[in-house]
Amino acid sequence: MAELTISSDEIRSAIESYTQSYTPETSIEEVGVVTDTSDGIAHVSGLPSAMANELLEFPGGVLGVALNLEDREIGAVILGEFAEIEEGQQVRRTGDVLSVPVGDKFLGRVVNPLGQPIDGLGEIEAEEQRVLELQAATVLQRQPVEEPLATGITAIDALTAIGRGQRQLIIGDRKTGKTAVCIDAILNQKANWETGDPTKQVRCIYVAIGQKGSTIAGVKAALEEHGALEYTTIVAAPASDSAGFKWLAPYTGSAIGQHWMYQGKHVLIVFDDLTKQAEAYRAISLLLRRPPGREAYPGDVFYLHSRLLERCAKLSDEMGGGSMTGLPIIETKANDISAFIPTNVISITDGQVFLESDLFNKGVRPAINVGTSVSRVGGAAQTKGMKKVAGSLRLEMAQYRELEAFSAFASDLDAASLAQLERGARWVELLKQDQYSPVPVEDQIVSIFLVDQGYYDSVPVGDIRRFNAELLEDLHRSAADAFKSIEGGKVLEGEAAEAIKAATDKFKQGFLASDGSRVVNEAAAGELGHEEVESLSVTRKHVEK
């Protein structure tokens, strides 16, 4: 029988080989326990190493965000369905802070505040993950707002112009057309998008916070119908969502926009509306037992909005020159703009467009109150052509509103006042616009120029909108070269201005008012100065049968 021999070297090498290839199946992780839960908030004991804003994993794959870090427990906001979360369940750390996927594939899609698609069109291929709580651009990384962003709304482009990188507040009571103004601004970017020029293209983001599901579906349908959905992303946190989703939705939208901004691209983002975000944050804070302040809002509600809106900027050329323009919407109660949230956001933004319910009910739409609406960027964000023709429009409109209120109590008015009322009524009609019908800047300049020069004075007020629409259609044919010379908002002057005037004179000869009368083709009255007005014989209408 052969002798069995075992080499010690073979034994050693076999053991070494086994130990090197062995992978332990156990791991160390922190596990917490839900101590109580209600209304989308969970208190978790344990997890001593959890970070602020860290994602926590609850049973069933439900995620939460660690907001309150206390000695013995964590206060977390549950993102998603919280009905199944119960006391005693285990909670695990993920090691990740809150972030969302971003990229060009998000254009044309509807996502929730976690960046997950909810439009039934399949998964979205992300380019990268972007942290939600990201520091805004520093002062040295910015440049002044000087590049205009046309909204297609004559009243805004002429009176409270918006520039790329600006934050312009849209404020007013419910049902005054706030959302419609912002949707029109998105629709007006279609012409720039179709050029294919990256310096002109504007990517749009519409953030719906606490809106009815049917309202969000209506916005999506309107964008789709007008061909604007291809360059727009919708971030939806409808009224049925938890307070956590409504709180996060604006930050998700801004993270998607910042991704493009830091690539040197231009972005327009609409927050509809931040009042509901503040109310959701108030609910979260009260449930987390944070001390309430004015109107029961927590002490950091100003920071909630300031750190969001400060992300809108026009970056310096060294940073790529990209921009993100913000249109936050705030809903007021009974036109009270002195309430807590409205005053907070007014102080953060670069101006506001105030929509008034009284004007809206009178049929003035968009119902913009010229007296309380302002752009702190001012003429820097206007094209040269618009700045020239609309320079005195704000003053004229303010004087008209004041005189209109006075005339309600006065029976006899002098010629100057009558002339101002007649001209003001025509300005009001010109600034009215139908929904989803943005006006190109060239058409705006020509219309304002002709009213300013007195060409609309002989047209009955009730026919102004029809006259303006038919005149512009005719001018695009008969004075096409003049329109080409003011493309991009160039100044209307010289031969182009004379061609517009001549074509307008010719058009007026064939225009019939609604009562069948012909508009007299009188010489342009020009701007109505005080000395000229006093010597001017003013009548209510100039028509000849």
Swiss-Prot record:
Disulphide-bridged cysteine pairs: none
GO cellular component, as recorded: plasma membrane; proton-transporting ATP synthase complex
Enzyme class: translocase
Keywords: ATP synthesis, ATP-binding, Cell membrane, CF(1), Hydrogen ion transport, Ion transport, Membrane, Nucleotide-binding, Translocase, Transport
The reaction(s) this protein catalyses: ATP + H2O + 4 H(+)(in) = ADP + phosphate + 5 H(+)(out)
Location(s) in or outside the cell: Cell membrane
Entry-linked InterPro entries: ATP_synth_asu-like_sf, ATP_synth_asu_C, ATP_synth_asu_C_sf, ATP_synth_F1_a_nt-bd_dom, ATP_synth_F1_asu, ATPase_a/bsu_AS, ATPase_F1/V1/A1_a/bsu_N, ATPase_F1/V1/A1_a/bsu_N_sf
SUPFAM superfamilies, sorted: C-terminal domain of alpha and beta subunits of F1 ATP synthase, N-terminal domain of alpha and beta subunits of F1 ATP synthase, P-loop containing nucleoside triphosphate hydrolases
Family according to the record: Belongs to the ATPase alpha/beta chains family.
PANTHER family, per the entry: ATP SYNTHASE SUBUNIT ALPHA, MITOCHONDRIAL
Complex and partners: F-type ATPases have 2 components, CF(1) - the catalytic core - and CF(0) - the membrane proton channel. CF(1) has five subunits: alpha(3), beta(3), gamma(1), delta(1), epsilon(1). CF(0) has three main subunits: a(1), b(2) and c(9-12). The alpha and beta chains form an alternating ring which encloses part of the gamma chain. CF(1) is attached to CF(0) by a central stalk formed by the gamma and epsilon chains, while a peripheral stalk is formed by the delta and b chains.
Name of the protein this chain belongs to: ATP synthase subunit alpha
Organism for this UniProt entry: Nocardia farcinica (strain IFM 10152)
Gene assigned in the entry: atpA
